[in-house]
């Protein structure tokens, strides 16, 4: 009887966590980006430092995953203001398989991002913006993505989350893309 009780408790906990999971970045509605048009999408991962307990990867795989995710999320906008985005991958952890519910490491990317305006040839952000990007909460990552996902899936998940974070950061600075604070607030209220 206790085994059944434990099993049901585990199922309920998994269901609760799944219900509270974050939205998949690829299923979010298209957001108003004003005059934004993605120019150069530059990702550099040559100096990326692996964290503890990580699967191995290389600069090429990191760069490809992030470039693809940025194109997927921001390449669809066709405004009049060409914006260049430069991303440096500072570090990463691609979770190894662990022991469920005891040691279930999470994946993370550490990024430094800069944004430039093509017309003025000036950097829009005064200081480089640093991001720590974690895997999204979902049923398949509850016990650690190292157990349920291969390296490619982990990289794709992290890269899509990074692209969403960068988009949200740009939207926090509406003047960069020809939006007013009111436009940005109205967009947030509509969602």
Set out the residue ranges of the language-model regions.
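N-terminal, post-signal-peptide region of Sec/Tat-exported proteins
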Residues: 56-82
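C-terminal motif of bacterial Sec signal peptides marking the signal peptidase cleavage site
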Residues: 15-19
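C-terminal/domain-edge helix-coil "capping" segments
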Residues: 21, 142-191
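Surface-exposed short loop/turn segments
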Residues: 78-125, 136-148
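A structural "domain/chain start" motif
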Residues: 20-64, 175-191
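Bacterial N-terminal signal peptides that target proteins for export
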Residues: 1-8
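Short secondary-structure boundary motifs at beta->alpha junctions and helix caps
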Residues: 48-56, 125-165
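Sec/Tat-exported extracytoplasmic proteins
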Residues: 70-78, 93, 162, 166-174
């Amino acid at each position: 009887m206790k085994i059944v009780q434990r099993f049901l408790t585990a199922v309920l906990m998994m269901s609760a966590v799944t219900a509270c999971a974050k939205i998949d970045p690829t299923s979010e509605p298209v957001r108003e980006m004003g005059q934004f048009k993605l120019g150069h999408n530059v990702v550099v991962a040559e100096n990326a430092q692996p964290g503890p307990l990580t699967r191995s990867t290389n600069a090429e795989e990191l760069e490809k995953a992030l470039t693809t995710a940025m194109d997927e999320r921001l390449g669809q906008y066709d405004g009049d203001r060409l914006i260049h985005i430069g991303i440096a991958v500072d570090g990463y952890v691609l979770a190894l398989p662990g022991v469920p519910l005891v040691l279930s490491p999470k994946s993370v990317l550490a990024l430094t991002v800069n944004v430039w305006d093509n017309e003025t040839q000036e950097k829009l952000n005064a200081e480089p913006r640093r991001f720590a990007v974690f895997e999204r909460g979902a049923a398949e990552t509850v016990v650690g993505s190292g157990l349920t996902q291969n390296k490619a899936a982990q990289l794709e998940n992290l890269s899509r989350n990074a692209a969403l974070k960068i988009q949200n950061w740009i939207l926090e600075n509406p003047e960069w893309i020809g939006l007013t604070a009111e436009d940005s607030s109205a967009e947030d209220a509509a969602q």
